[in-house]
Amino acid sequence: MRRTGTTRRGALTATGATVLGATLAGCGGDDGREDSTIADARAAAAQVENTLRLTAATTSRKLLVRYDQVVKAYPGTAAGLAPLRDAVRAHTTALSQGKGGTLPLSHPPATDAKAAVKELAAAERRTADAHTATLLKAPAELARLLASIAAAGAAHAYLLTEMAKETSS
């Protein structure tokens, strides 16, 4: 004898059909407000990324100025600093997306070459720390770039510390 009334299979089928119908009905009503909301969100995200890029580029540019000052004040350090300086220049270019900028010279380097290289190592550490802090707020692509630059900065700081040990006063 066959059961009469509502079966479990029938109840599940009816529930599934109702949910599917409600879901499909929600997909059709596009009145343009969602498009403007998405566009606003994208514009806000682009603004945040541009601000973070500008901040990071300015930080790297300041470091590049420090390298230039040390090389100018102590020409004997130029050969050792050249590859590191070139890398910092490449980082600055990548962050600024080719839009260059200049910064005024900051305070002069230390009174001797050894101290100047030590100060440069400390500046590299600060810059790497700043990029690391910024990458936490950055979108994925910029975060990867900042992570790479921060890692390079940490390596530069180590190399500069070792260079300072070998530099005569």
Regions of interest found by a model, annotated:
Residues R2-T6, G16, L20-S169:
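All-alpha RGS (Regulator of G-protein Signaling) helical domain and cognate RGS-like helical scaffolds
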